[in-house]
Amino acid sequence: MKNRVNSLWTLFQERRLSRRTFMKSCVALTAILGLPPTMLDTVVKAAETTELPTVIWLHGHECTGCSESFIRSSSPFTSDVILNMISLEYDDTLSAASGEPLEEHLKKIMAEKNGKYILAVEGGVPLDENGIYCTVGGRTFKESLVEAAKGAAAIIEYGSCASWGGIQAAKPNPTNTVSVSSVVSGKPIIKVPGCPPIPEVMTGVVMHYALFGQIPPLDSQGRPKQFYGNRIHDTCYRRAFFDSGLFVE
């Protein structure tokens, strides 16, 4: 007998939710991911057969604004993402546990899910004074990041701090803060810049990987094309005034 896949569909079955409710969720996910309606069957199949991803979320040099944005997602709701669509095993902001028990759990998950988990990172990486300007669990953030990145299947850089260095990297940059990709290499990296990013973009990126097991198509800067491919300016109803050179004085 085949092992049962811990997919989104099996989760719906365990909670005795109808097939109709499952299909509604798949339709919503298709729209959120910016996919055409013709991709619905692909999304449904992925939701039936793909195992829910394990996510480890690290916090570096940041203000937690990206997490504040993430927990305000409404399409889908953050509670649905965390409880139903992914397995968030570590986040020192959202986790119920703290201190040594949480850090021990992180080590356990990294060992059990080696090569299979998604590493979400929020915040830049300070390098001066051996990284002492940001420590978590008695270790520098750089140490924690490098170790966690080794076993990650993919890395998501949430926010401008993780993507580019952020405010901390502004001149004169006293802590020598850099982006995550300046420290980590050799892994698929998805940049989700913004201060903070749009919450639905944050959930959409992790859900794309959850459904298809691969990172979405990226632009030249490493950002997901479905979310960063067009400028709001291009579809603004005031664009005609801009093109005509009509400005308020």
PLM feature spans:
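N-terminal secretory signal peptides
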Residues: 1-17
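N-terminal export signals
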Residues: 21-43
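Metallocofactor- and cofactor-centric catalytic cores in central/energy metabolism, strongly enriched
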Residues: 47, 52-54, 61, 65, ...
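Hydrophobic/aromatic beta-strand patches that form the interior of the parallel beta-sheet core
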Residues: 56, 156-159, 190-192
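Short catalytic helix/loop segments, enriched in acidic residues and glycine
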Residues: 71-88
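Catalytic-core regions built around general acid/base machinery
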Residues: 139-152
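Class I SAM-dependent methyltransferase SAM-binding "motif I" and its flanking Rossmann-like core
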Residues: 165-186, 190-194
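A conserved mid-domain beta-alpha-beta active-site/ligand-binding segment of alpha/beta enzyme cores
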Residues: 202, 207-249
